[in-house]
Each structure stands twice: as structure tokens, then as C-alpha cells.
């Protein structure tokens, strides 16, 4: 049976993650309050931000920026986009 969570981003019950994505309290919070759908979308967006903004994960400032944007994204707030990115229309 699939575990469900009240997703912080989508404000509805959705399937949850299989395990915490990070160790510690941050990972536990994401595991308990973020759906698999929201986490998968964040991972795609994170990759786009790293590539388009040429973020260096060895740089503490770049990691802090990405962490802040993850918190915004998963909370349903306004978050940084890659410059010039236009989401595909249906």
C-alpha cells in the first residue's frame, strides 16, 4: 500500500516518498510533508537551475541558494527560474 502525505506544495493528499531524501530533521520534514510528485518536480527544476545558472555545488553560496530555492519551491512560494525559460504549453 502506498504511503500518502498532505503535500505542502499541492495542499492535498498525494503519494509520499519511499524514504527521506536527506539525513536529519530536514530530510524527515520533507519525507513527512512533501509528495513524490513535488519532489520529482523539484529535482528536475534543481537540475535546470544548476545547469542554467552554472551553480558550483562545491561553493557554499551556491548550495545555500539552492537550499533556499528548494524551500520556496516545496512550500508553493515564488521561486527562481532559469533565465529565458518558458514552460512547455499543452
Curated annotation (Swiss-Prot):
<dbReference type="Pfam" id="PF04362">
    <property type="entry name" value="Iron_traffic"/>
</dbReference>
<dbReference type="InterPro" id="IPR036766">
    <property type="entry name" value="Fe_traffick_prot_YggX_sf"/>
</dbReference>
<dbReference type="GO" id="GO:0005506">
    <property type="term" value="F:iron ion binding"/>
</dbReference>
<dbReference type="InterPro" id="IPR007457">
    <property type="entry name" value="Fe_traffick_prot_YggX"/>
</dbReference>
<protein>
    <recommendedName>
        <fullName>Probable Fe(2+)-trafficking protein</fullName>
    </recommendedName>
</protein>
<comment type="similarity">
    <text>Belongs to the Fe(2+)-trafficking protein family.</text>
</comment>
<dbReference type="GO" id="GO:0034599">
    <property type="term" value="P:cellular response to oxidative stress"/>
</dbReference>
<keyword id="KW-0408">Iron</keyword>
<dbReference type="GO" id="GO:0005829">
    <property type="term" value="C:cytosol"/>
</dbReference>
<comment type="function">
    <text>Could be a mediator in iron transactions between iron acquisition and iron-requiring processes, such as synthesis and/or repair of Fe-S clusters in biosynthetic enzymes.</text>
</comment>
